Curated annotation (Swiss-Prot):
PANTHER family referenced in this protein's UniProt entry, alphabetically: APURINIC-APYRIMIDINIC ENDONUCLEASE, ENDONUCLEASE IV ENDODEOXYRIBONUCLEASE IV
The protein's name in its UniProt record: Probable endonuclease 4
Molecular function terms, GO-annotated: deoxyribonuclease IV (phage-T4-induced) activity; DNA binding; DNA-(apurinic or apyrimidinic site) endonuclease activity; phosphoric diester hydrolase activity; zinc ion binding
Enzyme class: hydrolase
Biological process annotations from GO: base-excision repair
NCBIfam families: nfo, PRK01060.1-4
InterPro entries xref list: AP_endonuc_2, AP_endonuc_F2_Zn_BS, Xyl_isomerase-like_sf, Xyl_isomerase-like_TIM-brl
Organism: Salmonella dublin (strain CT_02021853)
Length: 285
């Protein structure tokens, strides 16, 4: 079964997120558990935690269907020790919030070397940052998102994702989230079914599908191989509809959150309905 949804707002309280997801016909959703542009947040209260869990149960969302995203400020590969510690503390807090909420995944951007340390050193710092957080939490998997490779961001090559995983001690609690826009901008072609098969065959060999714990389904305003991160609505960008139809009809993408971060929330319900329809078309073929 495919879990299909979008990154919904938690404005007014975390318990509002499941309701907003249900309103657009989603069977999965992503959210921020705190303000993504601030370092600190008030601790979760028992009431907030209970309300969120009750809402998830009411709208039939299990932890496997929810892909929280951490703060954009965090850089787990930061070259400066003080800033690295600040990011590690914030990441641990994000992991602990997920643990409190009964969530089992935390999606994050791996990190940037800021042109100050070698790529290999940055990747090693990211892996060690994950190890530190995993040692102090239980039940939450750290889900590394591939990037477009903009600026000094790492994680844009499958080999980089594999290198981070290789440095993580508890392989059972690390995974990846593949963002289609980011992959395309990083030079992984997705414009035809044949291109999709080639790209994901490469992913399977280098990273492994056993580590795929979620996806972000986004078309791309940015050009192929441009290393520029610009999302677009499905079928309106440079990737086109074929990739998303192909994903919907491939069983390797079952049972994980498939999350829209496309640019027009007003048509998320339509995009979700279209994605669902591709599965039906395959079943009837």
């Amino acid at each position: 079964m495919k879990y299909i949804g979008a990154h919904v707002s938690a404005a007014g309280g975390l318990a509002n997120a499941p309701a907003r997801a249900a309103e657009i016909g989603a069977t999965a959703f992503a959210l921020f558990t705190k303000n993504q542009r601030q370092w600190r947040a008030a601790p979760l209260t028992p009431q907030v935690i209970d309300d969120f869990k009750i809402a998830c149960e009411k709208y039939h969302f299990s932890a496997a269907q929810i892909l929280p995203h951490d703060s954009y400020l965090i850089n787990l590969g930061h070259p400066v020790s003080e800033a690295l510690e600040k990011s590690r503390d914030a990441f641990l807090d994000e992991m602990q919030r997920c643990e409190q909420l009964g969530l089992t995944l935390l999606n994050f951007h791996p990190g940037s070397h800021l042109m100050q340390i070698a790529q290999e050193d940055c990747l090693a710092r990211i892996a060690e940052s994950i190890n530190i957080a995993l040692a102090q939490t239980e039940g939450v998997t750290a889900v590394i998102e591939n990037t477009a490779g903009q600026g000094s961001n790492l994680g844009f090559e499958f080999e980089q994702l594999a290198a981070i995983i290789d440095g993580v001690e508890d392989k059972s609690r690390v995974g990846v989230c593949i963002d289609t826009c980011h992959a395309f901008a990083a030079g992984y072609d997705l414009r035809t079914p044949e291109a999709c098969e080639k790209t994901f065959s490469e992913f399977g060999k280098i990273v492994g599908f056993q580590y795929l714990r979620g996806m972000h389904l986004n078309d791309a305003k940015s050009a192929f191989g441009s290393r520029v991160d610009r999302h677009h609505s499905l079928g309106e960008g440079n990737i086109g509809h074929d990739a998303f139809r192909w994903i919907m009809q491939d069983g390797r993408f079952d049972g994980i959150p498939l999350i829209l971060e496309t640019i027009n929330p007003d048509i998320w319900a339509e995009e979700i309905a279209w994605l669902k329809a591709q599965q039906i078309a395959e079943a009837m073929a």
